[in-house]
Regions:
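Residues lining hydrophobic/aromatic ligand-binding pockets adjacent to catalytic sites
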Residues: 1-143
């Protein structure tokens, strides 16, 4: 399985969409616990609409998002706390179900995991893939 990841932290909607199209991504899998954003266009519904305009499917898998205490740890630079908290999140039954959905969706069509952080090293999307798709070929997109 090949899967892309992308963050929208330092980009415009145009650059974001162009990066996805250039990579051949056909589906965005939003793994934010709270799919709202202060960045224009990146909240769930506007994002879904913008993606649809360029022929990219949108799926939100909320249970794969980082819980509030994990987001606080990430903002404070407490990577070990983030890793511990997120590992607990992935042990929840709904996260297990959505992890399987993520793998199925990614196997079906070229897909990109979406979160805020530009750098995947500081984002839970890297933790998710390491835990739930360790053999996947991963390409990080940087719009």
């Amino acid at each position: 399985m090949h899967i892309f990841t992308i963050g929208y932290e330092a980009t415009t909607m145009g650059e974001f969409l162009a990066s996805l199209e250039q990579a051949g991504v056909k589906r965005v899998i939003d793994i934010r616990a709270v799919p709202n954003s202060r960045r224009p266009g990146f909240s769930k519904n506007p994002l879904k609409n913008a993606l649809a305009e360029v022929g990219i499917d949108y799926v939100h898998l909320k249970a794969l998002g980082t819980p509030a205490d994990g987001r606080s740890a990430a903002r404070a630079g407490r990577q070990e706390d983030l890793e511990r908290i997120y590992a607990g999140q992935l042990d929840l039954p709904e996260a297990m179900v959505q992890s399987e959905q993520m793998r199925e969706l990614a196997a079906e069509a070229p897909s990109a995991l979406l979160c805020f952080e530009r750098d995947p090293a500081g984002c839970h999307r890297t933790l998710l893939l390491a835990a739930e798709a360790p053999n996947a070929e991963v390409t990080h997109l940087f719009p």
